[in-house]
């Protein structure tokens, strides 16, 4: 989508906007990342259970990716996440687990139960000892960059 008026006002050569809201019917700019990571880590693992903590967008992508591959999925959310966002995740077959407290509390509970139950965590944020899956998530986002490059001849 070209933004000619804004481009003129800012004196830029070009400004483009890429609408990701319709990809996979996820209504999210994060549609590619989590789903891509789920696909890459689950190859040949039919009984894998995927888990993630989210405030909404990443969880939808992870849930969609798990559903597409017929994998069970557990998504942890804070008690403050809206019921609308919970429903958007549940419609892709994930079990949503509400956790008392904020996002960090939901992440800690996700880690605790995932370790206890041998579930595979798919988070988009790296830490000192957790880099591979966030890198896969970023690789999923890079698909958009390739598309933008083709669509804009840049």
Residue spans of the language-model regions?
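PLP-dependent amino-acid enzyme catalytic core
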Residues: 1-154
């Amino acid at each position: 989508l070209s933004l000619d008026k804004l481009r003129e006002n800012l004196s830029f050569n070009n400004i483009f906007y890429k609408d990701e809201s319709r990809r996979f019917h996820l209504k999210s700019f994060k549609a590619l990342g989590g789903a891509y990571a789920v696909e890459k880590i689950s190859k040949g693992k039919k009984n894998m259970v995927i888990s993630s903590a989210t405030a909404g967008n990443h969880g939808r992508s992870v849930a969609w990716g798990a559903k597409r591959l017929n994998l069970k999925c557990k998504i942890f959310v804070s008690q403050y996440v809206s019921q609308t966002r919970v429903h958007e995740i549940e419609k892709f077959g994930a079990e949503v687990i509400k956790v008392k407290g904020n996002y960090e509390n939901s992440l800690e509970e996700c880690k605790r139960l995932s370790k206890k139950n041998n579930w595979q965590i798919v988070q988009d944020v790296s830490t000192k000892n957790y880099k591979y899956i966030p890198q896969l998530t970023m690789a999923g986002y890079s698909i958009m960059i390739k598309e933008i490059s083709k669509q804009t001849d840049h």
